[in-house]
UniProtKB/Swiss-Prot annotation:
It comes from Photorhabdus laumondii subsp. laumondii (strain DSM 15139 / CIP 105565 / TT01) (Photorhabdus luminescens subsp. laumondii). It is an enzyme of class 7 (translocase). Its cofactor is FMN. This is Ion-translocating oxidoreductase complex subunit G. NCBIfam families: PRK01908.1 (NF002519), rnfG (TIGR01947). One of its GO terms (cellular component) is plasma membrane. The complex is composed of six subunits: RnfA, RnfB, RnfC, RnfD, RnfE and RnfG. The chain crosses the membrane at residues 9-29. Its EC number is 7.-.-.-. The gene is rnfG. It is found in: Cell inner membrane. One of its GO terms (molecular function) is FMN binding. InterPro entries: FMN-bd, Ion_transpt_RnfG/RsxG. PANTHER family: ION-TRANSLOCATING OXIDOREDUCTASE COMPLEX SUBUNIT G.
Length: 209
């Protein structure tokens, strides 16, 4: 009887060890796959705001943290630097439009250092479905209107929605959302023009504790 119980105990222990080991292996493989997919999605997002033909460096690994009121709050924002033949040519910068209709709108703005916007994407928002959510590419192509636009002065009156005398369309029944995005992209593109002179002093994302 004791021998039988001992054998059963050993069998259960071996089974438990095998199960634990298998679970650990599966979790490890799953985490690796999830991380790889996240990296691919992030690279795809960066390529939507900075055309890949413009740079030849590993843009995801050339990440810096910047703080500026122009970016919508006093929190660190990630900046991804694009280089061509070693020379900085553009950057993708996280930015916040704090004055959306339903709260802050998170953006990723790509621009060169002369004020030309290369692309903009909304990464997070809580705007009203059917109204303010037209800032999403899956809803409309409105956000693409920024590509190719240039801003060199904070006093450029073209950089406003049409209701405010500018050139950007607002949405029917929703002016606050596009106004917030236009103003945020404008501030971010202007701020990016100051980056080259401060590159040597920027904090690497990897240095953040």
């Amino acid at each position: 009887m004791l021998e039988t119980m001992r054998r059963h105990g050993i069998t259960l222990a071996i089974f438990a060890a095998l199960t634990t080991g298998l679970t650990a292996v599966v979790n490890s493989l799953t985490k690796s796959t999830i991380a790889e997919q996240a990296a691919l999605q992030h690279k795809s997002l960066l390529d939507q705001v900075i055309p890949p033909a413009l740079y030849d460096n590993d843009i995801q690994n050339e990440c810096y943290l910047v703080n500026a009121n122009a970016l919508g709050n006093n929190l660190p924002h990630r900046l991804y630097l694009a280089r061509k033949n070693g020379h900085p040519v553009a950057a993708a910068l996280e930015s916040t439009a704090p004055d959306g209709y339903s709260g802050a709108i998170q953006l990723l703005v790509g621009a060169d250092f002369s004020g030309k916007v290369l692309g903009v994407r909304v990464t997070e928002h809580h705007e009203t479905p059917g109204l303010g959510d037209k800032i999403e590419t899956r809803i409309s192509n409105w956000i693409n209107v920024f590509s190719g636009k240039t801003i060199t002065s904070n006093h450029d009156q073209h950089w406003a929605v049409k209701k405010d005398g500018g050139e950007f369309d607002q949405f029917t029944g929703a002016t606050i959302t596009p106004r917030a995005v236009v103003n945020s992209v404008k501030r971010t593109a202007l701020y990016l023009q100051t980056i080259p002179e401060h590159l040597s002093s920027l904090e690497s994302c990897g240095e953040k504790s």
